[in-house]
Amino acid sequence: SSAASDVYKRQLMMGLTSNLCLYDVFSPEGVAEEMRQCGFDGVNITATTDVKEAFTDAKYIISSGGAPRKAGMTREDLLKGNCEIAEQLGKDIKTYCPDVKHVVIIFNPADLTGLVTLLYSGLKPSQVTTLAALDSTRLRSELAKHFGVSMDVVENCRTYGGHGEQMAVYASTAKVEGKPLAGMIG
């Protein structure tokens, strides 16, 4: 996915790694070639469709391996298929790289796919995270617009659940210009 590709490019730009293995059940060679053409010095980029090759002795995994949402689908519609993908991911981690340091899940619904990956991988909760800050960032942006302030003065915005009608907002933690949101919205 482009989100994963962006994360990989940032890692290379920051010098966090010189070895990168791209794995996909469909050939990731096109993405690998695009990254090679970015001209990062001293970087080894491998592309493979073989999970054993990709995961054996991996130290960090960033997975965007879920199916994308199609027109008319809700995020909840993605749940079954993407949780099956997350289950297999967890099993593959347990088999090929049980000593992985950290896994980041960036496919939806991230809260559940992250949990499923965690349960099947045998890893500790501190070793599996999701990139799910989008909703909190959107909340922060909307509050800033609503109150006519900069996003810099909107703090501690937290949400829970997938970004849909079931999502909850923690109004008790959010602050706008240091004032509790709960007191501002009545």
Report residues per predicted region.
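Short, small-residue-biased leader/transition segments that mark boundaries at the very start
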Residues: 1-8
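Short, well-ordered alpha-helices that flank and scaffold nucleotide-derived cofactor binding pockets
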Residues: 9-13, 33, 37, 91, ...
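Conserved S-adenosyl-L-methionine
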Residues: 13-18, 125
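Conserved N-terminal Rossmann-fold NAD(P) cofactor-binding segment
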Residues: 16-58
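Rossmann-like NAD(P)-binding element
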Residues: 40-102
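General beta-strand structural signal in soluble alpha/beta enzymes
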Residues: 47, 63, 105-106, 127-130, ...
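Rossmann-like NAD(P)(H) cofactor-binding subdomain of soluble oxidoreductases
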Residues: 74-142
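Active-site-lining helix/loop region of Rossmann-like oxidoreductase modules
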Residues: 126-186
